[in-house]
């Protein structure tokens, strides 16, 4: 297998055009970077698999979200679409010219709104493509039919219930359905037999110590969180980028990291009013964070230079706290699919070297270690889970 090729950005000094990166539907899910979605396109496996990556997050806590584009005999399959800006569509048209039409669009999760929202617009851009969705789709606060959410009724199919796309080339394996109370978690993994590549959505991630290349297009989130106070400037150097990335990882996994304090309001406002800080890029100097000693060690525990896959902490504690058995069984089923070479999740790093042995080892580790703990860095997530159980929003222990 040829090693993955280096990143090839679609945006740069000469091509970074805001009008080509506009996403008009962002108010339906108002996440950073709002209406402007820069996209990085990387060829992960030569002439076989491509990654379309965009940033997405809250308060500059932004991590990559990925659409995988897989070349099949019939054309191209889009797995977990991202916002189809003009920049994204231009890149897809270029792939179509070389490898055939976009014939299949897959929404591989029932609950991930960030993956669900782009699908109708992507489907309209490729009117000949069949749209496949997981069973148990749901919306909140009202349960609406998919057609009311913009999915094309005449060419939308339900995975497993109405067949499987490209079953002669791909294997499909569901995790779930798992009862979340408000709705259902169901994710379907896809194995490309030819390349040994396993496409996933949210269940597993691999987090590298270095910031993803996507931040080269806009390092602002890294630089914002690399600071200690709001009156400090946004300095761009490798060390600031690494420090900002480690803090972003803590936020994204634990929501409120344990070694983090919120300074008094008057202190935050005093720093915000300092000269030189009154710009939108720095949120006008508002920086309500104070990091305590030990945060680096907690960040390092989430990262792996060898890209070992893991369950994201926020999913383990809020989605899977009472579903360890189902997750472990799914990992063992994935390991039995065949010869595995690469793992491509919809977030963080990709491609990740993988094997059946590595997945079985991860399953063993999850069975043996403490699961969804309550203390230390998990304390805030644990409080959220207990509150949701007490309110009857999510099911409690059985």
Task: Cite the ranges covered by each PLM segment.
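Divalent metal-coordination and catalytic microenvironments
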Residues: 70, 109, 190, 202, ...
């Amino acid at each position: 297998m040829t090693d993955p090729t280096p990143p090839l950005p679609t945006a740069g000094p000469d091509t970074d055009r805001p009008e080509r990166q506009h996403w008009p539907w962002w108010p339906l899910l108002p996440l950073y970077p709002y209406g402007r979605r820069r996209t990085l396109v990387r060829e992960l496996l030569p002439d076989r698999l491509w990654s379309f990556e965009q940033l997405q997050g809250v308060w500059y806590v932004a991590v990559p979200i990925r659409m995988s584009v897989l070349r099949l005999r019939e054309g191209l399959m889009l797995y977990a679409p991202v916002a189809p800006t003009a920049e994204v569509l231009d890149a897809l048209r270029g792939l179509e010219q070389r490898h055939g039409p976009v014939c299949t669009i897959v929404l591989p999760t029932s609950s991930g709104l960030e993956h669900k929202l782009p699908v109708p617009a992507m489907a309209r851009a490729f009117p000949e493509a069949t749209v496949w969705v997981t069973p148990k789709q749901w919306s909140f606060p009202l349960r609406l039919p998919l057609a009311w959410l913009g999915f094309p009724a005449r060419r939308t199919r339900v995975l497993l219930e109405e067949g499987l796309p490209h079953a002669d080339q791909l294997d499909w394996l569901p995790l779930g359905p798992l009862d979340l109370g408000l709705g259902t978690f169901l994710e379907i993994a896809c194995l490309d037999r030819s390349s040994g590549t396993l496409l996933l959505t949210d269940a597993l991630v691999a987090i590298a110590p270095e910031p993803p290349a996507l931040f080269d297009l806009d390092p602002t989130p890294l630089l914002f969180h690399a600071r200690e106070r709001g009156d400090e400037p946004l300095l761009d150097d490798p060390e600031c980028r690494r420090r900002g990335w480690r803090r972003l990882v803590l936020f994204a996994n634990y929501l409120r990291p344990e070694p983090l304090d919120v300074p008094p309001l008057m202190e935050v406002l005093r720093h915000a009013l300092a000269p030189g800080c009154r710009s939108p890029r720095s949120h006008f100097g508002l920086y309500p964070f104070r990091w305590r000693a030990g945060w680096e060690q907690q960040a390092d525990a989430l990262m792996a230079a060898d890209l070992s896959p893991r369950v994201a902490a926020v999913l383990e504690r809020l989605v899977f706290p009472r579903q360890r058995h189902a997750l472990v069984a799914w990992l063992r089923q994935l390991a039995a699919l065949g010869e595995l070479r690469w793992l491509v999740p919809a977030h963080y790093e990709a491609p990740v070297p993988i094997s059946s042995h590595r997945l079985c080892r991860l399953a063993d580790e999850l069975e043996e270690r403490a699961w969804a703990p309550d203390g230390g860095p998990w304390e805030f997530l644990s409080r959220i889970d207990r509150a949701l159980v007490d309110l009857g929003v999510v099911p409690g222990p059985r």
